[in-house]
Structure formats: structure tokens, C-alpha cells
């Protein structure tokens, strides 16, 4: 981990000498995101990764609100990302801290795109749907990465299109990376209450058990979000666009529930036995008493036949009862992924031979801003690429960006010195070979992975990624 010591005869931290700054590519509630390039290759650099000139996204965190330590959001990301390693999870390359002002910088491999921008490009520029092969490949890879996280007892808790990055260049072209672990948590069995963590998951992708105040929840909340993302890939617009209530730290989200009920119908205790135990269920009953929700038909909104494998998978992701909701491991075994077109490692390939690869837009780079966030650099030519881990666009967007930011109300840890967390050097991470997660067989209802006890010897290693051999033509 780089420190904040001054080097090179300047008043800038020595670790900055590793990078050639290109400019700022994003800004959010957490801080700033910069695009930089490596000046020298890493000792264990792989082909196209960690070599001289390789693009790197550097995420600078603001100080904690208390002003006496490192941002707790950054601590969460570091403690999880330094322990996990998978092809479909964003890779933490290095951690740097400037002791002078306790500013923290996380360096990631740079991804040129994210699902939010890909969906927006098809909706607003091309006016064409995303081809079935790309939709299936993006979804398969998302589930593959999520299965790895859930197998290691990690709940992401903030899955949404802007947090799903897509590589646009090099050997990893078309590979997705799950990013932004600021709200992620490790969960255990027996489950401990997680409600004290505050509001989680951006509202359009928030599971009904969270909206109804569940004190205990599982990785099933991530699968609901995946279902929402799947529908958005199919229709190019968010499935449940509720208006968020913000009157109190954790208000009753009636409008969001209303949007869900209008599509899926009203949940019942018969189909969801634990529904009556949820704290906000009585509030819901009072608000909608006498209101009849006619099931408008999810298949009509996503334009899928009710008997199609795609609709069956989507319906199982959007199951009200979290205990019955399909898991990532089960979803990977679904018939939908066994049918043509088969999913592949490069999700951005054309669906048919002879078709052109879609050229997705380049994110503007502010080349006048330095690492401290001040305006000082001379403008340079903007590089290709448009996304970075957890970034926020510098371009106005038609869909409200509050839906793309972490939720307000999350509990915060006190300011903390990094040394207390034993943040080790990241050289080992840089030398790892990402990917290779086993394809787990789907579990039955009686052995649901959400309820299994964590194995004491369970590690976070990697195995075979599980792509069928016939898919090699898609790589």
C-alpha cells in the first residue's frame, strides 16, 4: 500500500510518481474518480493488465463526516476487495493513503463502459434493443460474479446498472465487473440483524422485504436487483420507477411498493407466509386498504411469452418471498442459458456473423483537474473509455442520478486509522489471475443456500469459470 511520504524532490506524495494523470472522469458523494496510466509495468503484470501505459481508475475518497479518519465506505471496499478475486468482480490494484490529510486513493483496473451507459445508448441513440446474445451474456456473467460473492457470504446490497462495469478493450473485452462495494457486507448463519445498517440498495432495485422493513435479510435482496436489471436490459428502461420518500431517515416507500404491485400484483400471506411479520406490512395495509391491484402481467411489460425460459427465469428472480426466490447458483443452471444463443465471455460481440460491433460512447475526461481536485492541468486529448468503479458521470443524464447513488441513511463507522485494519500491500492482488469460479448445482428449496451455515474452512479461491466448451467461438 502506498503511503503519503513526499518523494522526488516535490511536495507531492511519492506514490503519485507511479501514474501519469489523464484527468477526472467522475464525481460523487464519496469523492472523485480519475483516469491515469501506469508509468511502469508491475513485476507480475499479465498481458494487457498492469503493463506500462495501462489505464487505471483511481478513486479518491473524502474524509469521514467526523473529519477524524478514513471514510468508512472506503474501509468496507478495501477489506472486502483485498480478499476476493474473480473475473467478474472489479479488481483492486493498489491502495494509497496521504497521511498529510488522511485522503485515501483506491486504484482499480479501468473499465470503459457500464450497463447504465450501454442501456442508455440503445434507448436514446440507437433506438434499438440490445441483442439477445449480449443480454444473455451480460446476465450470465453478472450471476457468475454474484454466485462467487454469495458463496463467500458477501451481500453486495447496491446492485444497479451503473455499478456493473464492462471492459471495452484488450483481452477482457466484453467482460463485466461488479463494482462499488461500499455497502457490501459479510453475512453469517444464524443470521444477525442487518437492519441497523440503515437503508441499502438504490430504491428502484430494492427488494420488497427491504421496503417492508425486514430486520433480517439475505443475499436474496441481490437477486431481486438482478431481476430488475434483467428486465431493464430487455426493455431499456427501469422496471419499477418509484418516487423515493425522504421525509425521515427510513420512510415508508409507498410509491415504490405501488409500482411493484401494479406489475406483479399484491403479495399475499398465502404465497409469502412471513409477510405478516414484516414491520411495515400493517402500514402498507392501511395505505392501500380497498385498493385492488390487477396483475397487469409482467410478460406484457418485458415483451416475453409467459412460457418462455427467459420469462420463467425473470419471474423466479422477482419472486416476492425471499425464501423462494431463485439463487445465483440456481439461475446459472437455468434452461435459459442452455438455449441458443449461448452466453459467452465477450458479451459485446455481434449476435450474428457479419454484424458490426456496437461502438459505445466515450466518457468526457476533465483534463484540467489534478489528483487533489484543483484545476491546474493543461488540456490533453481525451482517451477512449467511459466508466470507472463507482463513478458518477460528469454529463447530465435524463434518468435522475439520485437513483444511481448510494442511499442516504446508511450507518457509518467512526473515523479510523488505516493501520488498525492491517491494510497489507496489494502486490499479491496485482499478481493474481482473475476468474475461474465453479458452476454450482442448484439447491432445492429445503437446502436453500441463504440458510446454510458458513463452513469454517470455506475460502475465497478460484476454480473453473464454467463456460461450456461450445461457447469458445464467442470468446
Swiss-Prot record:
Entry-linked PANTHER family:
CELL DIVISION PROTEIN KINASE, CYCLIN-DEPENDENT KINASE 8-RELATED
Tell me which PROSITE patterns the record gives.
Answer: PROTEIN_KINASE_DOM (PS50011), PROTEIN_KINASE_ST (PS00108)
Q: Which residues carry this modification: Phosphotyrosine?
A: 30
| One Gene Ontology cellular component annotation held by this UniProt entry | nucleus
Q: What is this protein called?
A: Cyclin-dependent kinase E-1
Name the gene behind this protein.
Answer: CDKE-1
Q: Which reaction does it catalyse?
A: L-seryl-[protein] + ATP = O-phospho-L-seryl-[protein] + ADP + H(+); L-threonyl-[protein] + ATP = O-phospho-L-threonyl-[protein] + ADP + H(+); [DNA-directed RNA polymerase] + ATP = phospho-[DNA-directed RNA polymerase] + ADP + H(+)
| Enzyme Commission number, as recorded | 2.7.11.22, 2.7.11.23
Source organism per entry reads Oryza sativa subsp. japonica (Rice)
- Where, by residue number, is the active site? 158
InterPro entries in the record = CDK (IPR050108), Kinase-like_dom_sf (IPR011009), Prot_kinase_dom (IPR000719), Ser/Thr_kinase_AS (IPR008271)
| Phosphothreonine found at | 29
Q: Where is the composition biased (Polar residues)?
A: 366-393, 466-475
Q: What induces it?
A: By auxin. Down-regulated by cytokinin.
* Keywords, sorted A to Z: ATP-binding, Kinase, Nucleotide-binding, Phosphoprotein, Serine/threonine-protein kinase, Transferase
Xref: Pfam families:
Pkinase (PF00069)
Amino acid at each position: 500500500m502506498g503511503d503519503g511520504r513526499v518523494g522526488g524532490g516535490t511536495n507531492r506524495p511519492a506514490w503519485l510518481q507511479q501514474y501519469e494523470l489523464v484527468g477526472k472522469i467522475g464525481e460523487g458523494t464519496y469523492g472523485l474518480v480519475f483516469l491515469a496510466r501506469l508509468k511502469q509495468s508491475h513485476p507480475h503484470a499479465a498481458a494487457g493488465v498492469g503493463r506500462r501505459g495501462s489505464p487505471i481508475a483511481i478513486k479518491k475518497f473524502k474524509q469521514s463526516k467526523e473529519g477524524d479518519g478514513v471514510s468508512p465506505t472506503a474501509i468496507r471496499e478495501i477489506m472486502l476487495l483485498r480478499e476476493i478475486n474473480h473475473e467478474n468482480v472489479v479488481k483492486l490494484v493498489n491502495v494509497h493513503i496521504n497521511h498529510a490529510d488522511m485522503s485515501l486513493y483506491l486504484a482499480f483496473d479501468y473499465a470503459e463502459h457500464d450497463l447504465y451507459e450501454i442501456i442508455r445508448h440503445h434507448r436514446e441513440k440507437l433506438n434499438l434493443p440490445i441483442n439477445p446474445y449480449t443480454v444473455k451474456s451480460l446476465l450470465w456473467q453478472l450471476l457468475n460474479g454474484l454466485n462467487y460473492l454469495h458463496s463467500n457470504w458477501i451481500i453486495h446490497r447496491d446492485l444497479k446498472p451503473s455499478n456493473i462495469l464492462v471492459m471495452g478493450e484488450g483481452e477482457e473485452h466484453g467482460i463485466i465487473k461488479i463494482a462499488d462495494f461500499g455497502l457490501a457486507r459479510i453475512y453469517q448463519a444464524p443470521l444477525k440483524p442487518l437492519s441497523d445498517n440503515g437503508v441499502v440498495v438504490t430504491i428502484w432495485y430494492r427488494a420488497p422485504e427491504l421496503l417492508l422493513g425486514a430486520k433480517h435479510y439475505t443475499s436474496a435482496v441481490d437477486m431481486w436487483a438482478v431481476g430488475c436489471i434483467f428486465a431493464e436490459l430487455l426493455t431499456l428502461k427501469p422496471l419499477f420507477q418509484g418516487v423515493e420518500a425522504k421525509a425521515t431517515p427510513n420512510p415508508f416507500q409507498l410509491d415504490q411498493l405501488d409500482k411493484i404491485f401494479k406489475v406483479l400484483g399484491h403479495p399475499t400471506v398465502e404465497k409469502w407466509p412471513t409477510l405478516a411479520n414484516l414491520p411495515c406490512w400493517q402500514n402498507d395495509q392501511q395505505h392501500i386498504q380497498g385498493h385492488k391491484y390487477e396483475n397487469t402481467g409482467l410478460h406484457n411489460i418485458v415483451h416475453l411469452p409467459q412460457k418462455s425460459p427467459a420469462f420463467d427465469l425473470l419471474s423466479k428472480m422477482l419472486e416476492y418471498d425471499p425464501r423462494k426466490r431463485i439463487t445465483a447458483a440456481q439461475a446459472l443452471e437455468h434452461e435459459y442459458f442452455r438455449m441458443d444463443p449461448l452466453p459467452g465471455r465477450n458479451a459485446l460481440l455481434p449476435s450474428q456473423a457479419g454484424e458490426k460491433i456496437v461502438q459505445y460512447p466515450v466518457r468526457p475526461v476533465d483534463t484540467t483537474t489534478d489528483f487533489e481536485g484543483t484545476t491546474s492541468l493543461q488540456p490533453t486529448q481525451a482517451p477512449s473509455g467511459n466508466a470507472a468503479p463507482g463513478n458518477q458521470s460528469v454529463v447530465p443524464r435524463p434518468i435522475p442520478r439520485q437513483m444511481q447513488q448510494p442511499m442516504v441513511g446508511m450507518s457509518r463507522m467512526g473515523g479510523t486509522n488505516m493501520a488498525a485494519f492491517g491494510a497489507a500491500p496489494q502486490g499479491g492482488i496485482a499478481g493474481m489471475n482473475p476468474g475461474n469460479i465453479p458452476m454450482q448445482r442448484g439447491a432445492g428449496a429445503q437446502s436453500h443456500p441463504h440458510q446454510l451455515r458458513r463452513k469454517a474452512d470455506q475460502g475465497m479461491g478460484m476454480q473453473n469459470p464454467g463456460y461450456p466448451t461450445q461457447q469458445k467461438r464467442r470468446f
